[in-house]
Amino acid sequence: MTRPRTLYEKIWDAHVVERRGDGTCLIFIDRHLVHEVTSPQAFAGLRASGRTVRRPDLTLAVPDHNVPTTPRKDAAGNRLPIADPESAAQLAALEKNAPEFGIRYIDAIAPEQGIVHVVGPEQGFSLPGATIVCGDSHTACHGGIGALAFGIGTSEVEHVLATQTLLLQPAKTMEVRVEGDVGPGVSAKDIILHITGTIGAAGGTGHVIEYTGSAIRALSIEGRLTISNMAIEGGARAGLIAPDETTFAYLKGRPYAPKGADWDAAVAYWKSLTTDPGATYDKVVVIDAADIAPSVTWGTSPEDVVPITGTVPDPASFSDPSKRAAAAKSLAYMGLEPGTRMQDVPVENIFIGSCTNSRIEDLRAAAAVLKGRRKAPGVKWAIVVPGSGLVKAQAEAEGLDRIFIDAGLEWREPGCSACLAMNPDKVPAGERCASTSNRNFVGRQGPGARTHLVSPAMAAAAAVTGKLTDVRELMA
């Protein structure tokens, strides 16, 4: 009788090509997503060594990091030039490399273009039980549909392009179980912020986290993708949520998803992708969903999380000297004083978007708060950036764009946008941004930018009041 296995172990075992004496395994990669920032050197390496792409049919290229979110075509439909030379060069390289190596390429002006981690599941290219890699740290996002997905470096991008495999050490396993019902105003983003604050930014180091429990199962696929997206912020290699009927309903009929008898066979296999009764994890964390409130970050690490009803902590309250020093440094950068009520912190900028929170459910949540309201006079810059052209079209069909525009926010084209300072969307130095993205590192949204991570509804609430606000106060 085989021993009970976790979901991670099942997917791992199914992809082992070769096991080595030191425990390292050669793993087959089912799907490879490529974008413009981490791929130029990889393609150059292939070209220099005379190699081809081993499985172009398992590879999909999408530009997302550097693309501007302002209009990309003029009135005549001609493509507008990219102002930044480095960005223009990277985008041009991907546009040249993908067809040269026989890789499917979604053009920057194609209707289905978007953030790679939104496009993958949306197109059905990402599937349960698959191994998925991308030269991007937030590849863990695809774990929301039950895929083992993780980010890789540029040299590994080249290796996967050439061989469709990677040499990897197996990870430890960790369960984060969230049981019970969440309260009003609490979203998937609040759940993962709370988890990150609980386990810490290094809590999952060396592990793959499986998110379980009734609160996780109750989430939509959009919510599950948000959870897995930020597994890396808890230090984990990847995040996983077991596929179920919600997953199958989401994927059915998508362009790259299996069809007909292949679909039936796939679902039959996907149903086996659950952790066996009796399987053990290396680490287990249990969280009561009732303890989770609308949350916000105060510092420069994703673990710096408090409820919106809380206050800025005093560095002296940290017993660990390194954390005490980090907290003091964070507060100096963020321009905050210990004891300040989070609801008294003003914000000048609002960003609703990123691979964490730019799907249709996220935009609906923000629009529900903004409907019939206007952004506060103190908010200088507020943008809504859909995760893909298909999300944008759906939002416009539902009239969400009009709600955002009428509220005084800008409605943009799809892309990574202000999540990271690699395109024109940057937060000015010394100013704050209520952001639905995943990282609040020093300079992440621009040199000197001060980031507060929140949910889409919380970002919308901040837009209305001009300060960090408990969205529950604005809910009907």
From Swiss-Prot:
The entry's keywords: 4Fe-4S, Amino-acid biosynthesis, Branched-chain amino acid biosynthesis, Iron, Iron-sulfur, Leucine biosynthesis, Lyase, Metal-binding
Per the record, the GO terms for biological process are: L-leucine biosynthetic process
Record-level Gene Ontology MF annotations: 3-isopropylmalate dehydratase activity; 4 iron, 4 sulfur cluster binding; metal ion binding
Q: Could you name the domain of life of the organism this protein comes from?
A: Bacteria
The record's EC number reads 4.2.1.33
- Pathway recorded for this protein: Amino-acid biosynthesis; L-leucine biosynthesis; L-leucine from 3-methyl-2-oxobutanoate: step 2/4
The answer to whether keyword DNA damage applies is no
Keyword Iron part of the UniProt annotation: yes
PROSITE patterns, alphabetized? ACONITASE_1, ACONITASE_2
Pfam families according to UniProt: Aconitase
Q: What cofactor does its activity depend on?
A: [4Fe-4S] cluster
- Cofactor binding, note field: Binds 1 [4Fe-4S] cluster per subunit.
Q: Which InterPro entries match?
A: 3-IsopropMal_deHydase_lsu, Acnase/IPM_dHydase_lsu_aba_1/3, Acoase/IPM_deHydtase_lsu_aba, Aconitase_4Fe-4S_BS, Aconitase_4Fe-4S_dom, IPM_dehydratase_rel_enz, IPMI_cat
The record's PANTHER family line, in alphabetical order, gives:
3-ISOPROPYLMALATE DEHYDRATASE, HOMOACONITASE, MITOCHONDRIAL-RELATED
Assembly and partners are described as: Heterodimer of LeuC and LeuD.
Question: Could you tell me which HAMAP family the record lists for this protein?
Answer: LeuC_type1 (MF_01026)
Per the entry, what this protein does is: Catalyzes the isomerization between 2-isopropylmalate and 3-isopropylmalate, via the formation of 2-isopropylmaleate.
Q: Report the protein name in the record.
A: 3-isopropylmalate dehydratase large subunit
- UniProt gene name: leuC
